[in-house]
Amino acid sequence: MIQMQTELQVADNSGAKRVECIKVLGGSHRRYASIGDVIKVTVKEASPRGKAKKGSVYNAVVVRTAKGVRRKDGSKVRFDGNAAVLLNANGQPIGTRIFGPVTRELRTEKFMKIVSLAPEVL
């Protein structure tokens, strides 16, 4: 469950290391985002030679949450921390690699690129 001011790790090689959620997209008073939701983030910590610079604002898709996601069979998939993948204006990932596992809930038309780049899909 991601809300405003939640800090997330970045799960790609875009150059950002840590981002902060500044808005949950998808409704005027929407409070929480879960896996597969798009949020607006600002870069809080970045590597010196990356594409993403500190202070820049991007859209990002949430790929892992500590809260987890419940499946129809009753099982629940949870992670140790929260992570996101930065997106460009067209909704495509900025990085060319994804680090760590992602969930099957991302298998929509919009995020198939992220699923195909991920080393493991849970």
From Swiss-Prot:
Pfam families: Ribosomal_L14 (PF00238)
Gene responsible for this protein: rplN
GO biological process: translation
Record's keyword annotation contains Transferase: no
Subunit details: Part of the 50S ribosomal subunit. Forms a cluster with proteins L3 and L19. In the 70S ribosome, L14 and L19 interact and together make contacts with the 16S rRNA in bridges B5 and B8.
Source organism (scientific name): Francisella tularensis subsp. holarctica (strain LVS)
Free-text function comment from the UniProt entry: Binds to 23S rRNA. Forms part of two intersubunit bridges in the 70S ribosome.
Protein's name in the database: Large ribosomal subunit protein uL14
Protein family: Belongs to the universal ribosomal protein uL14 family.
Keywords assigned by UniProt, alphabetized: Ribonucleoprotein, Ribosomal protein, RNA-binding, rRNA-binding
PANTHER family on file: 50S/60S RIBOSOMAL PROTEIN L14/L23, LARGE RIBOSOMAL SUBUNIT PROTEIN UL14M
InterPro entries assigned: Ribosomal_uL14, Ribosomal_uL14_bac-type, Ribosomal_uL14_CS, Ribosomal_uL14_sf
Annotated Gene Ontology cellular component terms: cytosolic large ribosomal subunit
Gene3D superfamilies given in the database record: Ribosomal protein L14
SMART domains assigned to the protein according to its UniProt record, in alphabetical order: Ribosomal_L14
Keyword Ribosomal protein among UniProt keywords: yes
GO MF entries: large ribosomal subunit rRNA binding; structural constituent of ribosome
SUPFAM superfamilies reported in the protein's UniProt record: Ribosomal protein L14 (SSF50193)
Domain of life: Bacteria
